[in-house]
């Protein structure tokens, strides 16, 4: 997936678990444009992971082995925490 194809990335942000939608969608909407190209690639790679893995990582029940994915999970968590709750 290309880093500038925002429609496809937005669609990939839609997950099968509401908990993931609450974490991933606001991050994409509010933060994606400010990411570096490398961070955008890591975000896209993260979206290719299975929902159970994403859920566990974002809820601090484990972490990805890949260091770039780990950094992206931490970035999503910190930016979402700083922004506060978002109604969906």
UniProtKB/Swiss-Prot annotation:
What GO terms fall under cellular component here?
cytoplasm
Q: Which Gene3D superfamilies match?
A: Flavinator of succinate dehydrogenase
Which Gene Ontology terms describe the biological processes this protein takes part in? succinate metabolic process
Subcellular location, record wording: Cytoplasm
Cited SUPFAM superfamilies: YgfY-like (SSF109910)
Q: What keywords is this UniProt entry annotated with?
A: Chaperone, Cytoplasm
Partners and quaternary state? Answer: Monomer.
Q: Please explain the role this protein plays, according to its UniProt record.
A: An FAD assembly protein, which accelerates covalent attachment of the cofactor into other proteins. Plays an essential role in the assembly of succinate dehydrogenase (SDH, respiratory complex II), an enzyme complex that is a component of both the tricarboxylic acid cycle and the electron transport chain, and which couples the oxidation of succinate to fumarate with the reduction of ubiquinone (coenzyme Q) to ubiquinol. Required for flavinylation (covalent attachment of FAD) of the flavoprotein subunit SdhA of SDH and other flavinylated proteins as well.
Q: Which family does it belong to?
A: Belongs to the SdhE FAD assembly factor family.
Name used for this protein in its record: FAD assembly factor SdhE
Give the species this sequence originates from.
Yersinia pestis
